[in-house]
Amino acid sequence: MQALACYLKGKDKKLAPSIKAYIEHSLQKLDYSHELDFSALQTTGQVYDLKNMYQALNEEYFDQPLGLHITWFGEKRRSVGKRVTFGLFHDPLRLIKINRLLDNRHFPDYFVAYVIYHEMLHYVCPTYVDEKGQKHIHSKAFKEQEKKFKYFKDAQQWIRENQQYLFEGSY
C-alpha cells in the first residue's frame, strides 16, 4: 500500500515492483471467457483442424483439461517484410489464436502443434513480475515444459531452416 500511495501522490515516477507484480497477478485471475462469441471461433482450416490438434495435445501433455478455446486469426497471406506472429494467448478470454498463415501444407503438422502447445504453456506457466519489477513471459518453468514437446527440436530446426522463407512472405 505504501508503494501505491507514493506512486499516486507523485512521489515515485515509476511503479514499484510490488505494484507491477500485484497487477500482473490480478490480471491472470480475470476470466472473461464467458464473453466469447463461440460461433465466431474458427477451428477448421483448409489443412489443419485446430480443435482436434488442441484436444490431442491436451490429452498427451496435461493431466487435466485446460479449458481453453482456440481459433484462427489473420489473413492467409501477408506483406513482405512484416513481422509474423504465429500464435497468441489472450489470458482473460482463455483464448489461443493461431495465425491463419500456418493453415498451409508448407508448415508441417508438428510445427503447427508446437505453436499450439507453446500457447497452451502461457496458461500453464503464466507471466510473472520479479522482485526487480521485470516481467517474465517465458519463465524457466515455461522453457523446461516447452522442451518436453516431443517435436521440440524438429520445430526449432524447421524454423532455422525456413527463416528466409518466413521473412520473404512467399508462402
Role assignments for model-derived ranges:
Residues 1-113, 123-171:
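Active-site-proximal or metal-binding-adjacent scaffold patches in catalytic folds
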